[in-house]
Amino acid sequence: LMGGGMGMPRFEAAVVGNLELAWLIPLALIGTVCGWLYFVSEHTSEALAHAIGDRPVVKAMLAGLALAICGTVLPYTMFAGETQADVLMETYLTIPAGVLITTGLVKAMLTPALINLGWRGGHFFPVIFSGVSLGYGLAILTGADPVFCVAVCTASTMGAVMRQPVMVVGLLLMCFPL
């Protein structure tokens, strides 16, 4: 009933102790800031798209250039995130914490920019991936349970972006066990 599906990652149960509880609020605040960065990028890229006007080739080339630059420096920003979230589950310890955190923040800002410049797709999977990457990076820095960090960061990032808490809980039940 609540298994993974539709390309969504499925995480194991988190271990919650005193360390995790101490980090709950800071992690939620960081995830919320990630969601706010999404909106900063959305408003900025809307203004840019409006300034460019009805020139779809210019918009597509600018979006492609942004994606190419980000993808060269941070390869996990290249795709929507369904598959990359599963890869991060297995490999996050081999990636520096700063790279994971930066990837999460850049992905959150890159997604609305690409959409506003005419690229197709939605924000749902990229926002989940932003929270996952951010959470794994913060787990490395804090020593807290990785699944706990991922759950808090993903929930707070999605909550900030979607602004529909019941929907966020419902969607995240497909990724995280009760």
For each feature predicted by the language model, list its residue ranges.
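Alpha-helical transmembrane segments and immediately membrane-proximal extracytoplasmic
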Residues: 1-178
